[in-house]
Design a protein with these regions (language model features):
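Helix-capping/helix-break motifs at membrane-protein junctions
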Residues: 124-125
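Class I (Rossmann-like) S-adenosyl-L-methionine-dependent methyltransferase catalytic domain
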Residues: 1-49, 57-107, 146-228
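Conserved beta-strand/loop positions that form the S-adenosyl-L-methionine
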Residues: 53
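Alpha/beta-hydrolase fold active-site loops
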Residues: 111
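A conserved beta-strand element that flanks and buttresses the S-adenosyl-L-methionine
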Residues: 115
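Short catalytic micro-motifs in class I SAM-dependent methyltransferases
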Residues: 118-119
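A short glycine-rich, Lys/Arg-flanked "PGG" loop and its adjoining helix->strand segment in the class I
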Residues: 129-141
Length: 228
């Protein structure tokens, strides 16, 4: 069911938006219910500097802080309006920050882990590849990249996934897509991760009405140069 994993930390994260504009509050509450962010959060390291790419209104970044006080989190998004809402949810500026940035063109700062949640499908496949490569530049060898995404499948749940995104984009809650989305197949997604320099495993999200998965990637060691 939607929101199968719930947590007190997620409730606290949502509560941070109590003074946000009504539309933003509505979206945040809907996202908290539908996206099962608590399931994704458990795969993120409990401490260190975490960069959340395409953070939107910042709900997942807030959850990361609420769930583990030893995390320092930076959320980056191109939408200035969403970043303004996200900054309104910040109480602990030393540990949680939001910045306007282009995750396709700009390399994120060096960090201990990168997260990307429900973002890549809005980008053409070549831009998805660029985002993954940018994430790789921010990580040391073995550094984790945690990505929640939706897969293209011959599955009734994929029709539900696609229809919901048409609604959210049409209502203006999500930017990008322009009524076209870029959901890769499992094989295509794995190939993109590998091409960006990651080794990756896939975690199925249980009891979901959508084709959601979590890609658990780690930056692969550099291959030694062949002997002359």
């Amino acid at each position: 069911m939607p929101g199968a994993s719930t947590s007190a930390a997620l409730n606290r994260a949502v509560h941070r938006y109590r003074a946000a504009p009504f539309g933003a509050r509505l979206f945040v509450h809907g996202r908290a219910f539908l996206s099962d962010l608590a399931f994704v959060e458990r795969f993120v390291p409990r401490k260190g500097f975490i960069v959340d790419l395409g953070c939107g209104h910042g709900l997942f970044a807030c959850l990361l802080r609420e769930a583990a006080e030893s995390r320092r989190v930076l959320g980056i998004d191109l939408d200035e309006r969403k970043i303004e809402v996200a900054r309104g949810a910040v109480r602990d500026t030393q540990w949680l920050r939001f910045e306007v940035g282009d995750i396709i063109k700009d390399q994120p700062p060096h960090c201990d882990a990168v997260t990307i949640v429900d973002v890549l499908y809005l980008l053409p496949f070549e831009d998805q590849q660029r985002v993954l490569k940018n994430a790789a530049t921010a990580l040391g060898e073995g550094g984790p990249l945690i990505v929640k995404a939706q897969e293209r499948r011959t599955d009734p749940r994929f029709a539900i996934t696609y229809a919901q995104e048409l609604v959210t984009v049409g209502l203006g809650f999500t930017r990008g897509g322009h009524e076209r989305f870029y959901f890769p197949s499992r094989d295509d997604a794995l190939a993109m991760f590998e091409h960006a320099g990651f080794v990756v495993e896939v975690e199925e999200m249980p009891r979901r009405p959508y084709t959601d998965v979590v890609y658990l990637a780690r930056k692969a060691p550099l291959k030694p140069s062949p002997a002359a």
